[in-house]
Amino acid sequence: MRERTRSDGETKMVNIGNEWDNLLADQFRSEYYRKLRAFLVDEYNRYNVYPPADCIFNALKYTPYSKVKAVLLGQDPYHGPGQAHGLCFSVKRGVMPPPSLKNIFTEIHSDLGIDFDMSVGELTDWARQG
């Protein structure tokens, strides 16, 4: 959770790298966000927290606002090393997909006839498509 300094000297707390930066700029400068960020920095310093700090905004990094077509929301965050990487239900390549993701694949296959490799649970390509 490193801060970046802009050319005007103002510290930028988040750098997503696309249009989300402008859309959320006021939020990232707000008092509630500063408190939340301080809390998270402390948590990351004291505990094993998932996803890694540099992955927190991956969903926004991979999907610019103008490209969003669907939003997936998860209920139970991943809590093991190598699982969470900032995309709901997704796990990095080489990590077996959890049952919840396999259920999603099964439902999509049932409804739309689309086949999935059940051994790959990395959804970055989905995020890039919106």
Where are these regions (language model features)?
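N-terminal amphipathic/basic-hydrophobic helices that include classical n-h-c signal peptides
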Residues: 1-11
